[in-house]
Amino acid sequence: MADVGGGVMNVTFEPCCRNNWHIHHKQVQVLICVAGRGWYQEWGKAPVEMTPGTVIAIPAEVKHWHGAQKNSWFQHLTYHKDVQEGAGNEWCEPVDDDTYNALK
């Protein structure tokens, strides 16, 4: 993991908690679900359920969000790899309640 930028982080979401849509510029984000149940979704694509053991590598420049399911805590490890000069995050609009509440 020599190319990991910023180290590994442990992130916990309470039920119904999710982050805004966001983009990781010039870096790949890796999510590893370690507990609970969550969601991952790329802009314009169907949501993906995350359960313990699910690993998702998010390519640079892909707009996405992730967070807990309505009735479950969600914990994931995350790190960035292939980090290039000028890498950063762009935070976008919230995931609207209607979209989130329609997830099953």
Predicted segments, located by residue:
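A short glycine-rich, His/Asp/Glu-containing loop-to-beta-strand
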Residues: 1-21, 27
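Double-stranded beta-helix
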Residues: 3, 7, 65-104
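Conserved hydrophobic/aromatic positions in well-ordered beta-strands
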Residues: 9-11, 31, 77
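Short, surface-exposed charged micro-motifs
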Residues: 10, 55, 65
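Residue-identity detector for threonine
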Residues: 12, 51-54, 78, 99
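A short beta-strand-loop-beta hairpin characteristic of the jelly-roll/cupin
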Residues: 18, 23-54, 62
